[in-house]
Amino acid sequence: MNAPTPLPIGLPDYAELHCISNFTFLTGASHPHELVARAQAFGYRALALTDECSVAGTVRAHMAAKEAGLKLIIGSRFTVRDAQGEPWLRLVLLAQDIDGYGNLCECITQARLAAPKGDYRLLADDLAAPAGELAHLRGMPHCLAILLPDYDPDPRHLLAQAQWCRQVFGDRLSMALELPLRHADDRHRGTVAAVSEQTDVPMVATGDVAMHSRQRKPLHDVLTAIRLSRPIAECGLALAPSAEQAMRTRMQLAFFYQGERGAQVLRRSVELASLCDFSLDEIAYEYPHEVVPEGQTPAGYLLAEVMAGAARRYGKDIPSKVRAQLDEELALIAELRYEPFFLTVYDVVRFARSQSILCQGRGSAANSAVCYCLGITEVNPESGNTLFARFLSRARNEPPDIDVDFEHQRREEVIQYIYKKYGVTRTALAAALITYRTRSALRDVGRALGIDLGVIEQVAKAQAWWDGRHEFAQRAGQQGLDPESPLVQRWAGLIEQLRGFPRHLSQHVGGFVIAQGKLSRLVPIENAAMPERRVIQWDKDDLESLRLLKVDVLALGMLTAIRRTLDMLDALPGRRAHYGAPDKLAMQHLPDEDTATYEMICRAETIGVFQIESRAQQSMLPRLRPRTYYDLVIQVAIVRPGPIQGGMVHPYLQRREAVRNGNPDCVTYPGPEVKAVLERTLGVPIFQEQVMEIAMKAGGFTADEADRLRRDMAAWKRKGNLTQHQARLMKEMVEVRHYDPAFVEALCRQMEGFAEYGFPESHAAGFARLAYVSSFLKCHEPAAFFAALLNSQPMGFYSPSQLVQEARRSRVRVLPADVTASAWDSTLHARPDGAGGQPDIRLGLNRIRGMRPAAGERIVVARAQAPFSSVEDLAHRAALDRHDLSVLAAANALLSLAGHRRQALWQTLALQEPGQDHALLRQARPVEAPLVLPAPSLGEEVVADYGSLGLSLQSHPLSLLRPRLERMRFVTAAALAGYRNGQLARACGIVTVRQRPGTAKGTIFVSIEDETGAVNVVLWPRLIERQRREVLHARLLGVYGKWQCERETRHLVAQHLVDLTPLLGRLASSSRDFH
């Protein structure tokens, strides 16, 4: 029996130079921060993150390594292909310095752009003989190269690979010696060593690390199965044979790499690591220069444009408060040299306005007088209590975040302007990291484990959107599985591990990164799913960590709707003069503080308007009863986790009610220092800025410390960094300044609420303006407003069907889509009877499902030349094929030419396709008597309307069901309005909205709609758990409950639910679910 190999004395130094994270999607089984933490715990000298043709995880690794005090090396792994495109060899490239990092990023970019999204293609010639603009990448200067031999390779193949790599990379080449504890380790070691000696390429120990811990091996297998789209049982040799791709301790490394040769290859890892001296902190970002006219400086040009804007905003006499704020802001901007950043955003906004594209800055930018004068934001900082430190801070030393919303249907014009101005080599969209959530992890893990697909879908459907980690086994048990079985427990455990894992990179909703030089030397660029779109490999959090400029070009549907409304009104006789517009009607021409508008808002008649249309907002409106613009600012912000978790909502409402009733003495302040901060909100903190100001005035925080508090509030859920701030506030405010502990505790809870989702005052102010404008238009111009909403879909909280119902409740007549009258968009038409009031809305051809825009345009053009005389005339002159005609017939849009939809469909079937009209057959057509088909019933018409239009103008579905519902003793929404508080009631309606706010402690709010209106239903958690299927899946919901009404706040508290969906038959309906 052989004696055991003695363990070495002392632990060797080691640097891991071949390590992938879960940013090698569906391959790596650990997060970057987990790998860093394990490398630091094992005492590694350095760690190289070498994800596959990617640096997407490097910023996370960089931040973790800085915190851990571990040296991080930036690198990447590649499969290099031969001239025929076949995989030939694998290697790792490591950046030695900033030039090497730039070369690495360009190499990754070249490979990624040469392949479809999610793939890459790197040819041997791309490294050995790149041409043109990439000639400087020949041999990848300033990068170390490590050849990765296959396991137990053919010596001849490895020799050829090593000789080629030696020729390309010279002395910067090493050869990896990886020992995965498999059957041929000794032979593998010998082959690699022999080729190393033959080619004079030194060996280096590397680990081929794919996980930080051996416990991740089951997850690694699942990822392999997902990547290969097959169950684990069918993956065979594609699975890693053991857990040896986990990080090894230095004791294990000493055991695997024994003897002098072993010690040498371990030392080589540290020597190579010492040659890499690059950190992401060295990245020097340079702002674009062309925004500054030739001959001017950035500071001088910004000052000139700001003062010109101030003159437009305020006239010749700029208020002293505004002038002082401008001076302060401009001085700080100059000190931090951020002028090009502001000018870049200004340039984009100026382009949009030149094209009559509505836009508006949002967020903390509304704290800035500079942004207001440049026209980036529309909230006058003089009208509120702005906190500039929230927007720009000296201590933060990073560009501020300026988000600009543009019309969602015209944002593409702005995007193309940016591409055209700066070029595709200097600008790209930020990435959005798509990660696994519960349901996607549930499905993918289930398939990997070989669980029946039907069972997977049943469990997935039972899993509600709000369910977390603890509910899975219970839901599986409800579907007939044993929740304690090893399979279900394994399923649940792997779902938990996979949740939050990166799945792939997508494109950010609108965050552009723009550079002065080649962007691809800062960060790799790859193809996005959309044509002509490119994304960088970092997301917005990565960019913020590295202080890189991101210009957010966001899309907002309400801006589209408002602009379309104003355009429609502008075309109506007398409307421009009515609003006092000298030329084109714009938002600024609408009157402020309109009484009728606020009356409508207080009645919660806000379906379709911006921000205050949700169930929670509608419930709050009759209680808060906004009467001024600033009331709307509070309204927008108060239905958020910050004020709710801080317990600030009810105290504010109570004080507001008392003041309204003539009792202002109820407004008290917790201390004299904070009175000025809280006066505008009746002594109750509502906004994030107020928390920051209280910290400064009563907690001893400096402005920069308050800004750190803001950042930690935003990151609390991820990092939990609020404890230190909360402890400091408690100590300073309670112990030193003797504030009421209950007030400070509530303030601390509010900080955590802002981490969930809270509006700063500046953000709420911008959104409140749009809420007011959209409310005014709904109140006074409902026809134009609802037509614009229909033309702006998809957007908003409510479906087109609900918007049409609301338009009718607003006394607007809606006419059906018809080829003899409809344009592509919905349009306004004067009432034919000459009566005054609102014009009619004629639904556009764009509402017809399956209708192609080009066909719709041809119909409109042909009709302008002469009216259509028949379906055949329509088909001929508008060049419509059978598909076009069939969708028009199904939508009843041929009614004027052919009669009801059955008759119309019959006629379209009789027509020949364009180009198939044979003269001989046409002359031989038999003479037939016209076939008259029976008209559909009203119920059939409604079902067909919903199938082709998503709505019906003929009847509400519940009107048809009303006799049956009455026999079941369900009453209408209109009848419920007369019920007394506490009365038992039954209601039935189509589910239109489900909401489960995180602050509602498990309560779900449901809206159901019948032919007379909507009913708001409250579902308590106990009922939800008892009747999950009805809550989640019912489309037609019967509710037994208790009616509650207080002033204008009315809802039905459910006690029992009935799923009546089968009564709808083939009617297509869907709800919009929010959480």
Curated annotation (Swiss-Prot):
- Top enzyme class, one word, equals transferase
Q: Where in the cell does this protein reside?
A: Cytoplasm
Kindly indicate whether the keyword Cell membrane belongs to this entry.
no
Q: What does it catalyze?
A: DNA(n) + a 2'-deoxyribonucleoside 5'-triphosphate = DNA(n+1) + diphosphate
Q: Which Pfam families match?
A: DNA_pol3_alpha, DNA_pol3_finger, HHH_6, PHP, tRNA_anti-codon
GO BP, one annotated term: DNA repair
Q: What Gene Ontology cellular-component terms does the record carry?
A: cytoplasm
Cysteines paired by S-S bonds: none
Which InterPro entries does the record associate with it? DNA_pol3_alpha_NTPase_dom (IPR011708), DNA_pol3_finger (IPR040982), DnaE2 (IPR023073), DnaE2/DnaE/PolC (IPR004805), DNAPol_HHH (IPR029460), NA-bd_OB_tRNA (IPR004365), PHP_dom (IPR004013), Pol/His_phosphatase_N (IPR003141)
Q: Which UniProt keywords apply?
A: Cytoplasm, DNA damage, DNA repair, DNA replication, DNA-directed DNA polymerase, Nucleotidyltransferase, Plasmid, Transferase
Q: Which SUPFAM superfamilies match?
A: PHP domain-like
**Which Gene Ontology MF annotations are present?**
3'-5' exonuclease activity; DNA-directed DNA polymerase activity; nucleic acid binding
> What's the chief localization of this chain?
cytoplasm
| EC numbers | 2.7.7.7
Question: Sorted alphabetically, which HAMAP family does this protein's record hold?
Answer: DNApol_error_prone
Q: Which family does it belong to?
A: Belongs to the DNA polymerase type-C family. DnaE2 subfamily.
What is the annotated role of this protein in its UniProt record?
A: DNA polymerase involved in damage-induced mutagenesis and translesion synthesis (TLS). It is not the major replicative DNA polymerase.
Name listed for the protein in its UniProt record: Error-prone DNA polymerase
Species for this entry: Ralstonia nicotianae (strain ATCC BAA-1114 / GMI1000) (Ralstonia solanacearum)
